[in-house]
Amino acid sequence: MRHLPLLFSFLLFAFSCTPSPPESENNITIEFWTIALGDGFADYINDIIATYEAAHPGVRVRWVDVSGGEVAEKFLASLVGNDPPDLANIYDLPRFLQYNVLASMDEFVAPEEKEKRLVNFWKGMGYYKGTNYVIPWYSSVNMLWYNRALFEAAGLDPNAPPKTIDEMFAMGRTIRRKTGKYGISWRLHPSLGLPAWAILRIDGFWPLFNEDYSKTLINSPIAAAILQKWVDAYQDEVLPPEALAAAHRDDVNWFIEGRAAMLPFSGGWITRYFDKSFEAKAIPTFQPRGKLGLVPATNQVLVVPKASPHVSQAVDFGLFLTNDANQLEFCRRAAILPSTKKAAADPYFFREPESLADQANRFSARDIPNSFVMAPPDISGWSRMEDILYEEFAKALAMEQSVQQALDRIENKWNHLLSFQ
């Protein structure tokens, strides 16, 4: 959106001029937004709301379910109109964090409540310049699906899946050479899969900027070697050619259709799309590691706008929604993982699996302690910087320029943007 900085400047001015009125737990209504939970989880959400309202007689919670495709724009419009939700599950956090429109959870959440949360999620998606602005909710941790039949057809041992990224690429090349299928179903688009900055982090190259964010560190031989590895894999057709511009769920379809032999994913919910024939071929295992030694994780988060007149009550409801018991119950209903310590340690995640989906979820759950949250750098203007990284990396993948040329251009463009901060 071209006028986004202007809109947020207006918001900052409006917030400073119209402070929220004092709160009281007497006849207030909290507006609560979720993303695409209305169809499958209405009973779960409504039960939580009813329980909370019963314990807080003066509070009512108005639940609004928003589609994923429109939530960021709808949230922005609500801020501009000075009528935001009190508690919201949103995407595109960097867009909002840099403009100081969200309440600090470090300020409103007591230390004993923070301690209940897994630290990688508390200091994850909403951690910006030393402060956390989100309440972590449900999460996902990557594991790997692979196709037994394609492994066997390529002469690979189906009982010995790859343990590292390099092994995954090597097996992917063998599969491509011997079967004509792609080795790995992987999306490289920043809004869908693992973008270039996450690829660098997986292999141990981090941070991307110096301590005072005055210049980038990305133009490094280490970064060049990591990105070259991916360019080589793309050119060797280990990855499908559509990986750069993949649409939502394309990577899942490539795997299920037998076009690709391996699919890094998060748990077992995709088994709903497996037929009996494919169930016999699909095997779950741990996510292959890069040099970092950790696996990627993501999590859904809740935010409270500063403009809410009910910040404290919204935070209280958010903590109730995301407590151990409620997160564990959510995980029993869906192939997701919790973001609290007690829930993550529950025997439910380590029980004997009853299905293929359970097997996959167990691999994800066992790697919660070995995960890092795929949070982008906490720097102003990151959205534009990420676009630059994607554009230049895409040109390198397409052999329109070398990796070194891409890094030179990224460095120049990023440092130019940093000079204005």
Question: What residue ranges belong to the model's regions?
Answer:
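Short, well-ordered beta-strand elements
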Residues: N26-D39, V59-V64, D86-L87, Y133
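Extracytoplasmic "Venus flytrap"/periplasmic binding protein-like
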Residues: T51-N120, Y127, A153-G155, A160-K163, ...
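Hinge/lid segment of periplasmic solute-binding proteins
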Residues: Y91-M143, F169, P195-L200, E279-I283, ...
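Short, solvent-exposed loop/beta-turn-alpha elements that line the ligand-binding surface or hinge
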Residues: D106-V119, P161, W186, G204-A225, ...
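Extracytoplasmic/periplasmic solute-binding protein
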Residues: Y133-W137, N142, E167-T216, A260
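A bilobed periplasmic-binding-protein/Venus flytrap-type ligand-binding module shared by bacterial periplasmic
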Residues: W145-N147, A297-H310
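Glycine-centered hinge/linker elements that transmit conformational signals in sensory
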Residues: M171-T174, D212-L244, F274
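Long, aromatic- and glycine/proline-rich binding clefts that accommodate carbohydrate-like moieties
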Residues: I283, R333-E391, K395, F420
